[in-house]
Amino acid sequence: MVRGKIEIKKIENVTSRQVTFSKRRSGLFKKAHELSVLCDAQVAAMIFSQKGRLYEFASSDIRNTIKRYAEYKREYFVAETHPIEQYVQGLKKEMVTMVKKIEVLEVHNRKMMGQSLDSCSVKELSEIATQIEKSLHMVRLRKAKLYEDELQKLKAKERELKDERVRLSLKKTIYTHLCQVGERPMGMPSGSKEKEDVETDLFIGFLKNRP
């Protein structure tokens, strides 16, 4: 007879749960004993019941097995964390270096702004003056470039206005000339009205050729 597959989930019935716990615990310890004998392995197993009772099995002294396990885990943990510690130490050194660079830049910036100059030597003051002159030169170049760009824009606008003035002047000249010679400029209404003869005689009778 084929045994049905048991669904793995919590057994709700307390009595059935205790019976199953006892059977499975005995089976587990039996398998652990067989593994230690057949493979000459150091095996230990500990189980706490739902009520907190301890059940244990060990192929040798369980304390020695636990001690061996603790030493292994400590060595494993150290081996695993060593690269991490090195990485963290590297980050700390990098952070210290960056902080020092920031401090140097802040001091330099204050000196460039004319602050904290009392502690500067003649050489440092000369270097600061040279850097200020370079900065002023760059500012002047940038200012001149902006002025030149603005001047070019104004000149371009001036050319556009001149062209527009010439175009309007030419248009006005042509219009004046056409008015002087008596021609109607394009788009202007005519000053004379054409006469049209319309025949409006009343005729009664058959249609004939009219004279």
Swiss-Prot record:
Domain K-box: 88-187
A matching Pfam family: K-box
Localization (cell): Nucleus
Domain named MADS-box: residues: 1-61
InterPro entries, alphabetized: MADS-box/MEF2_TF, MEF2-like_N, TF_Kbox, TF_MADSbox, TF_MADSbox_sf
A GO molecular function held by the record: RNA polymerase II transcription regulatory region sequence-specific DNA binding
The UniProt record lists the keyword Transcription: yes
A single BP term in Gene Ontology: cell differentiation
Knockout consequences: No visible phenotype under normal growth conditions.
Protein name (record): MADS-box protein AGL72
